Regions:
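Sec-dependent bacterial lipoprotein signal peptides
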Residues: 1-20
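Bacterial lipoprotein signal-peptidase II cleavage site
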Residues: 22-32
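Hinge/cleft segment of the Venus flytrap/periplasmic-binding protein
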Residues: 56-83, 224, 228, 316-371
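Extracytoplasmic "Venus flytrap"
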Residues: 57-108, 115-128, 145-149, 208-216, ...
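Hydrophobic alpha-helical segments within soluble ligand-binding/sensing domains
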Residues: 69-73, 179-204, 216, 244-247, ...
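An alpha-beta-alpha
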Residues: 85-86, 90-97, 104-106, 190-237, ...
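Hydrophobic alpha-helical
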Residues: 141-161, 221, 239-299
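Flexible loop/hinge segments that line or gate small-molecule binding clefts
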Residues: 149-186, 190, 293-306
Length: 371
């Protein structure tokens, strides 16, 4: 397969905070006002190994754990929250974050706990002050959705010393924290296998942004399409997290690649923008995405080019975080093997299993750790 990256990256330093909000970022600049632009091209060659395109023994597109993984049982008496106070750090007021943080908040408050909910608006530099404040006020637990925990080791250690659980989702895997997440790379494989089944051959456009979770999805997608001999053209702006940005990138990509059979959005908003571009161009390409946000379900329901997404199950992750921390406050150890992320299963969603309007994908999620 030929994998061509045709992306124009424009990265103002003052906006790099958004990139590091969900993981590490290696980009840097000494000028806070200038914009650095680079163009990157990557070529790969197809191999004879096609195992990546095969569905694993556990069908990960139907909420099963991957072959070789170890299931982790989540349990905890949530009535433990009575009279307790916690801090929740939320990346931004977007579905991908609030689908985790809001069920978590509800679980704690409905069981008598008090929540200090803080949204950093995409700015991870606000996290240290929040953690310091929560340490000083001696909260009973700390939660974080999507804000990179790099550099916070000393604060995490202080919480650990105080027996204060730190439970996170999509925020790295720092020592001392219980790290939950979706298997982002596997999400890419799931949507990749769907495309192989639907189009068989040809060219696919991926519109993506520079974020660790999105790059992991790209890696899984690339693996599957490469094995099937399908060409992947990658476009997008580093900070292009909006539907409008994705639409602009895909419109240009379709002009250069009018025979593309499919367009993939790195997450929900990018998929919605891609669908608008495909419609405007009069293209026959199908559009797919990953996340399982309400806007994706609405796009599938509309009956246009948007036909599938991978639902991560953030809601179940929030409920699991509530149970895990409650169990730890009660004096029990964290579940699973220490130091390894606890991953939630995902579900491929099409028109055939689309949730009702206003509802999330309801398949019970399993949690697991990789070898």
């Amino acid at each position: 397969m030929k994998n061509s990256r045709k992306a124009l990256w424009a990265i103002p330093l003052v906006s790099l905070a958004l990139l590091s909000a969900c993981g590490d970022d290696n980009s840097s600049s000494s000028d806070t006002t200038a914009t650095e632009e680079t163009t990157a091209t990557e070529d790969t060659t197809a191999t004879e190994d096609t195992t990546a395109a095969e569905t694993p023994a556990g069908d990960t597109g139907k909420g099963e754990i991957p072959e070789g993984a170890t299931e982790v049982v989540i349990e905890g008496d949530v009535t433990t929250w009575e009279g307790k106070t916690v801090g929740i750090a939320n990346l931004a007021p977007v579905p991908g974050a609030e689908r985790w943080s809001k069920p978590l908040q509800a679980c704690i408050e409905e069981n008598g706990g008090t929540v200090d909910f803080q949204d950093v608006g995409g700015d991870p530099t606000k996290l240290p002050a929040l953690l310091e404040g929560w340490a000083a006020s001696k909260v009973d637990a700390v939660f974080n959705i999507g804000i990179d925990m790099s550099g916070q080791e000393s604060l995490i250690a202080a919480f650990t010393e105080a027996k204060t659980p730190v439970v996170i989702w999509g925020a790295g895997n720092p020592e001392g924290a219980v790290a939950l997440d979706a298997n982002q790379e596997e999400d890419g494989r799931i949507i990749g296998r769907y495309l192989v089944e639907k189009i068989g051959s040809g060219q696919v456009i991926l519109v993506n942004a520079n974020n660790p979770a999105l790059q992991s999805r790209e890696k899984g997608l690339t693996e599957v399409l490469k094995a099937a001999g399908i060409e992947l053209v990658v476009v997008g702006d580093a900070l292009g997290f909006s539907a409008e940005s994705a639409q602009k990138s895909v419109e240009a990509a379709l002009q250069a690649n009018p025979d593309a059979k499919a367009v993939v959005g790195g997450f929900g908003s990018l998929g919605v923008g891609a669908a608008a571009a495909v419609t405007a161009a009069g293209s026959d390409a199908i559009v797919v995405s990953m996340n399982g946000d309400p806007e994706e379900y609405d796009a599938i329901r509309a009956g246009g080019p948007f036909v599938a997404t991978v639902a991560d199950g953030h809601e179940f992750g929030g409920e699991a975080a509530c149970q895990i921390a409650a169990n730890m406050i009660a004096g029990n150890p964290a579940p699973g093997e220490a130091g390894k992320q606890i991953l939630a299963t995902s579900v491929l969603v099409t028109a055939d299993n689309l949730p009702a309007a206003g509802e999330s994908e309801g398949t019970p999620r399993k949690f697991y750790q990789l070898p």
